[in-house]
Amino acid sequence: MIDTVEYAATTPDQPQPFAELGLREDEYQRVREILGRRPTDTELAMYSVMWSEHCSYKSSKVHLRYFGETTTEEMRTGMLAGIGENAGVVDIGDGWAVTFKVESHNHPSYVEPYQGAATGVGGIVRDIMAMGARPVAVMDQLRFGAADALDTRRVLDGVVRGIGGYGNSLGLPNIGGETVFDSCYDGNPLVNALCVGVLRQEDLHLAFASGAGNKIILFGACTGLDGIGGVSVLASDTFDAEGARKKLPSVQVGDPFMEKVLIECCLELYAGGLVIGIQDLGGAGLSCATSELASAGDVGMAIQLDTVPRRAKDMTPAEVFCSESQERMCAVVAPENVDAFLAVCRKWEVLATVIGEVTDGDRLRITWHGETVVDVPPRTVAHEGPVYQRPVSRPESQEALNADSSKGLPRPVSGDELRATLLALLGSPHLCSRAFITEQYDRYVRGNTVLAEHADAGVLRIDESTGRGIALSTDASGRYTRLDPYAGAQLALAEAYRNVAVTGATPVAVTNCLNFGSPEDPGVMWQFAQAVRGLADGCAALKIPVTGGNVSFYNQTGAVAILPTPVVGVLGVLDNVARRIHTSLGTEPGEILMLLGDTYDEFDGSVWAQVMAGHLGGLPPMVDLAREKLLAEVLSSASRDELVSAAHDLSEGGLAQAIVESALAGETGCRIALPEDADPFVMLFSESAGRVLVAVPRPEESRFRSMCEARGLPAMRIGVVDQGSDSIEVRGQFTVSLAELRMTFEAVLPRFFG
């Protein structure tokens, strides 16, 4: 028997499994108050998924408002769409716009790594499609458990194959990201996928419905049982030792070839002016798409749910309405354009069905074979869900953690000890080559990738006639954020900003994905609140806006949470990609190596402390956002005037790691001369922020120095590139061959996962 609105009104006391669906008692009672009766089974399913943590942001919303409060009108200049849309959109000049966003698919990627990661890519790509853009590239931020943990191989193998399999099939280059191993992610991997798309500004589309009588068309794949309760429920729960594998049926199944056709179909529909509003079907499926479209447009909607094409027999209305089957879109189309819309879909062999229409008023009415199974105000579903001011409390352990400095750890002193330290860090899972992973992705498909592997940021050509392009980088540091959430978020922002700047691009906008433990833990909420404020204040200092993002809570097993991991993505613009700066040394004979920025004795939270002593404590490096802004301006000017031939950001592993990576990328040796009054260990391995290694063509050294001095940016000569050498020499300390460095650097991941 179908539970209709009429039947629900006459059976107020019928027991309902609201708790099993994730609703609290008070939330369930609020639904009853809104409706003036008990909800039908379909309504209950809809409210449960739409009021879940993943869909409603009910624990984070009060803190996320700070992004809006700190965004000035000056920062909004050039932002065409921001927080609240499927993805942020920014003006990059010459009539072009870029849309980009990062989202999590963490929990599904643990339950079923291949499909979890693959559909994570598919979902973020559809968000970009829904803005009217052509997706042009993807990136990923991955966090796995310890490299030697038994389950890490299963998860990593599936996740990497899923990302590569879906992205490669779509013909989208993977232009960068990060892979981090830490035992805190055992059982709780992070899979954060970013997609970037390009559009002409006049082609921008938004997610709203308007115009009574306009038709609602569902197009794409058929609706099945896969993903019932999927991401919206999984991402709102923690894992226990036994429960993870039981959740397998809730993970969606992706078809990248269907999505590839869907991309081309959407672009032709946009070009024909056939779309009024559009929404992709992701978490919560059709229940989300219809309620959000109606709510955003302040209209009603009538949907005949039984007309939805299904690939499983005997599906209930609730299952059809809340299915998270992939590769589906929902469009608002004028009646006179329906035939043309359907004709385009037939051309691309995309299934399309008129399932309803926009109505006057404020009711979302869903019928099943003529009987009403949903009759609700859409705003109460999509935008007026519960909002919680969760208890926030600085953990009692925080003071002791910050007092536990790394200064007492034994440090290398002799040249042999420094050499051994370099090789130990380089040969650890933390700093080793990621080529074993990235070589499974296509980085250059479509022919517009200018920088990818070995680069601090991915660079894409947008306009072939002018050379206009973009740079993208994503960064995060859970270790720094654990020590100080406010500073940790700013350090992630600073590094992503710096990574974009070292290509010569001007940073213009930010996206984020905030990965934390349970919001029911006051200590986790303190970390979250501090990180949000740090990121928002940092963006205000740099004068670049947050255009959108994602929150992923409940990343913990039992009472043990992951390190707080705010992932920050920064978008930059290059007026001509021909002037981009790469990381490889040796493109000019006799390049001068210079270190920009100040180096301090800062090792708390460093990779050195982790690898050599398993230590995490103290305070993270200082962050100076004014210095970061100055660095970006200098690098942009140096790129434009061709004063710098290579540049590499300093972060984990410090100067030593940056030198090795740039030397290996250029397959050339170099000679390093550290200041005589400096501690070689500090100079080589400190992780002080705001620093960049640059290679300057010998004839330009004087001009470059003068530019840095005029702007007040410290610039120290630390060596030269030696194209006739096959080793790195640190004068008075040690020499190590490129062959030994490469073998150490590249052997680690194949040893664990090959």
Swiss-Prot record:
Q: Which residues form the active site?
A: H54, H105
Provide the protein name.
Phosphoribosylformylglycinamidine synthase subunit PurL
Q: In which pathway does it act?
A: Purine metabolism; IMP biosynthesis via de novo pathway; 5-amino-1-(5-phospho-D-ribosyl)imidazole from N(2)-formyl-N(1)-(5-phospho-D-ribosyl)glycinamide: step 1/2
Q: Which residues bind Mg(2+) 2?
A: D127, D280
- Class in the EC hierarchy, top level: ligase
Give positions of region: Disordered.
Answer: 386-412
| Annotated ATP binding sites | Y57, K101, N512, G549
As for subcellular location, the record says: Cytoplasm
For this protein, the record's InterPro entries field holds:
PRibForGlyAmidine_synth_PurL, PurL_linker, PurM-like_C_dom, PurM-like_C_sf, PurM-like_N, PurM-like_N_sf
Q: Can you tell me which family this protein belongs to? A: Belongs to the FGAMS family.
Can you provide one Gene Ontology molecular function annotated for this UniProt record?
Answer: phosphoribosylformylglycinamidine synthase activity
Reactions performed catalytically: N(2)-formyl-N(1)-(5-phospho-beta-D-ribosyl)glycinamide + L-glutamine + ATP + H2O = 2-formamido-N(1)-(5-O-phospho-beta-D-ribosyl)acetamidine + L-glutamate + ADP + phosphate + H(+)
A single cellular component GO annotation: cytoplasm
Q: What is its EC number?
A: 6.3.5.3
NCBIfam families, per the entry:
FGAM_synth_II, PRK01213.1
Quaternary structure? Monomer. Part of the FGAM synthase complex composed of 1 PurL, 1 PurQ and 2 PurS subunits.
Q: What does this protein do?
A: Part of the phosphoribosylformylglycinamidine synthase complex involved in the purines biosynthetic pathway. Catalyzes the ATP-dependent conversion of formylglycinamide ribonucleotide (FGAR) and glutamine to yield formylglycinamidine ribonucleotide (FGAM) and glutamate. The FGAM synthase complex is composed of three subunits. PurQ produces an ammonia molecule by converting glutamine to glutamate. PurL transfers the ammonia molecule to FGAR to form FGAM in an ATP-dependent manner.
